Amino acid sequence: HTAHIGSESTAPDVSSNGNISVISRFNESGDGATATVGSGNSSNVNVSLLGVTESLALAEMEAQAKAAIVNGTIRAKGNVDVQMLGRLIAKAEVYNGSTLGLYNATVMVVRANAKGSMEALLNAKTIEAATVNVKNDYYAQSEAETGFAGGLVAGIGSASSNVAYATTSSTAKAAFGAAAGGNITGSISLENLGHVSAKALGRSATVTVSGLNVAVNVINADLNAVQNTSFTYGGKLDIKGDVNIRSEILREGDFGKADAQTGSTAGASISLVGASANKATAATATQNTLTVRGVGENRMTLTGSFTARAKSVTESFAKAALPQSLGLASIGSMISDSSTRDVVSVTVTGACMEIDGTFKAESIGNTASTSEAHKAGGVGVVGATATTSDAKVGAASDKPQTVGLTVTGGSIQALEDIILRAYNTGKAQSIVKKGTEVSGIGITKTSLPTNSWYSTNVSVTGGAVLTAEGSITLTSEDTTEAKADATGTNIGFAINADFTKGENHITSNNTVTIGAKLQADDSLTVTADSKATMTAKTVADGGGFFTKGTLTAINELIRSCLITVAENSDLSANHGSLSICANAGENDVITTTAKITSGGVVALGKVRTDLTLRTTSKVDVHDVGSIQNRFGAVTIRANASQNGVVTNSSADCSGLGVAPDVHNQATIELESDVNIRNV
């Protein structure tokens, strides 16, 4: 589905005394692809019977939609407008009509895939216009719902899981290009706006059947959208207004979210088949990339300001839960797993600009990862069961939540300010709630850890020259948060203290690298700043029967803030301050609490808090040309702090015949260094 002028192989010249518009609209009605098991009356249904034990509903939407002006010379006395407005939607579900009986139902496998591409492109040789507007406003949604199609059956067989997979893996592009320059008498707006989501649900059966084999639910929601926004020019490009570039993955309603939730089965004395876990997994792994590139001998003159912002706001939510109406059920294990691994980047390469206003580039990542599991177990549970709620920001140490901003080469001159900022913030929260169990039979493990990995950086290298009549500000910030609360009142019965604990782990790396010339007539400020909020809480109170081992709460924070001013750099300010500061821990709030109260049914007296805090803050200045403030001070500082750190252990177990044994363990390593050599 394409609306276009020109192609890769042709280069038409287009002239207009008015406006030039290329607009592509795709699936604005939002119908998409739909598949329903058990409906039997839809032309968009793809239903397969896999053997005799599984039914499959598969909904896929893979489309390419584009609005484009490619190559050639564009001359318009009015405006040039290129817009892509479209929706990629895939929905697959189990029909839950009341006409289906209680027999001959199978395990339901439901998959919804929303993929394909949406593009808004203006790539001309030269362009003359009043204003230019390039906009890609797109939607990509996948929804999968599984469960019982109105009935249950004894002897389902080896297949044992109702499955729902919702995957959104769309790609989106928005581009402005003027290979040989041009003249714009107004402003340029370039926008790439993503409304993306993935939702997978496991429905709860509403019938009550005795003595039957039923399946558990396995639910996955994956949000893997990729978004690229580019502004490219060569030659001489004159702009009489502003340039605004905006690349955003939006968090509005269900958009910006991977949502996976299980229901469960209902009825008395139901036994599981094969698999024994209800599992919900939600993951975001979006990529949002914005590039500004000057090609060859290039020069941009701008009477207004230049603003480039890439921003992603995402959420991953996984919930393994039970319907409140569930009776004395054997439900097996409950597992929820949420993670975010988003990448946001802004790159400015080889751009030569003369700006009458302000140059501002921002890269922003804001994410939340929440995992919630209801307690497993119950009468008649066979074998070991577990409740696990695992929340992650980042997927692993080598796959962190990443936000970066890079300027390489080129020259940027601004009559006002130059602002470069990378901001990385996230929250990981793990929750375990009371389930429906009435005893501790078969419950062996309840855990709710959080793990987070962050990477944040600002880099100005390659001999870039930044000159401002106002101030120059380079800032790399991370704000991290983690919460795990294991309180007996919230969790319920039968809690094994060796496994059940409030537990958080955060690793953060924050860097600023300068290999360039920075000249500010006012102030020059370079900052790397890291702040953490952590709450680990384990409380044995009247709400739960704690047994075995030691009651423990754990917080671990490992982070570094590093500023490097590399060889051949020149930094100068005239009428304001010049500061280079790496700050870590100054605004932390870290609370670690382990507590036993006599009001609980608590068969232990050992209590521990375990805090590990390793913070490195460094400024490394070496082999630079000069660092100079003509009329003010030069401040170079590295600050590694432990403000806001509280640990609390207590045991009140009088009358229970248990001797209290209480310890606080804190390992705190703070390293701050300023290294200046050959300056």
Please name every model-derived segment.
Residues 1-679:
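Low-complexity, glycine- and small/polar-enriched segments
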